[in-house]
Amino acid sequence: MIQFIDVSKTYDNGVQALKNINLTINEGEFVAIIGLSGAGKSTLLRAINKMHPITSGQLLVDDVDVGPLKGKPLRLLRRSIGMIFQSFNLVKRMSVFNNVLTGRVAYHSTFKTFFGLFPKEDKIIALEALDTMGILEKAFTRADQLSGGQQQRVALARSLAQKPKIILADEPVASLDPITTVQVMNDFTKVNRDFGMTIVANMHHVDLALKYATRIIGIRDGNLVFDGPSTEVDDDTLVKIYGRSLAHNEILGVEE
């Protein structure tokens, strides 16, 4: 469970990215955060694993107060939270298999992982994660030889190998073509359904958010302006979140 209690975030330049946010995300939910660029979506997402520390309020993950965490307790929190980025964050010159193995780094000493001394169990976990994502045959291919969609699947496999309870996805399909986007979103649905992992994703394309997420969080100018089931989102709701009708490039317009 993730709880925001009167959470605010002000950056050093004075920009108030989050304003008194109160919300609870339950275990196993698939939540999409939507809103204009600069609304505070990424700040909200990255506050959960303290990539962007909050300024005030309280943020709890499984009843642990994230705010004071540092050192080993913070590393343990981040071990339980997978992170997917728009840019994939793979080591391009490494094999797919070794990239996925890095999901196990937090379970071992720096010395062992620096020299690639992963136990057999970790290697099995990495291969199983690749199999789950349907790219086991690419295990020993260099990451930079894969398509964008395949690279994002490797990133998701890396998160699976981490054995997290929560996966945070920051615009995970923004750099993909429409067809590949649908394939990757289906992968997120599979992870959520088959493993019961909580998925919290920032989404640029509203129709994708409504199709795949069961719950929508709308952020506007740092404020929480909507929180409810995706089935309850209508045109009036979107105007409330975006302040206007949606532009064409915010609608993906691709059917599965």
Predicted regions and their residues:
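Helix-to-loop junction immediately C-terminal to a conserved catalytic motif
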Residues: N49
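Conserved ABC ATPase "signature" region
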Residues: V64-D65, H108, K112-E137
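Conserved ABC ATPase signature
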Residues: R142-L146, Q150
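Conserved catalytic motifs of ABC-family nucleotide-binding domains
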Residues: K163
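Catalytic Walker B motif of ABC-type/P-loop ATPase nucleotide-binding domains
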Residues: I167-D170
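Helix N-cap at the start of a conserved alpha-helix in ABC-type nucleotide-binding domains
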Residues: P178-T180
